[in-house]
Design a protein with these regions (language model features):
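A short, charged/proline- and glycine-enriched loop
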Residues: 1-3, 117-118
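Substrate-recognition element of Asp-dependent hydrolases with the DxDx(T/V) motif
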Residues: 89-104, 108-127
């Protein structure tokens, strides 16, 4: 059987989600003038984000709940006071700004250049 197509999952394979996510959060925290420890936030947020993605994949929560609850729980664990209105705004702005950051993993372009012309390449994502 000849391989004709190669499929890539965008996040964590080609696109450096963690780096782009940190940059997007940094931007929106500055936009809303939130004096928050970004390193501590990232440490707390990452496992919470994974937990909510698991619930979403299991169809136990909606995408809107995923986006809101992961932030709300992170802020609560940090004991960082922020209104529900701001959490909703941050959740929305995070998604809007995430695509503005396009850092890829090392050698991504090398691999894609190697495969170009040999295979039909496709990018998929669940985000």
């Amino acid at each position: 059987m000849e391989i004709k197509h190669v499929f890539f999952d965008l996040d964590h394979t080609l696109w450096d989600f963690e780096k782009n996510s940190r940059l997007a959060f940094g931007f929106i925290f500055e936009k809303y003038e939130l004096n928050i420890n970004k390193l501590k936030f990232d440490e707390i947020y990452q496992p919470i984000n994974e937990k909510y993605w698991k619930l979403y994949r299991e169809e136990r929560i909606s995408k809107e709940d995923l986006r809101y609850q992961r932030l709300k729980e992170s802020f609560d664990l940090m004991e960082f006071q922020v209104s529900d209105e701001i959490v909703h705004l941050l959740a929305h702005d995070y998604i809007e700004n995430l695509a503005n950051y396009n850092h890829v993993f090392e050698n991504t372009y090398v691999v894609l250049d190697y495969l170009k012309g040999k295979y039909d390449m496709h990018v998929i994502t669940n985000g």
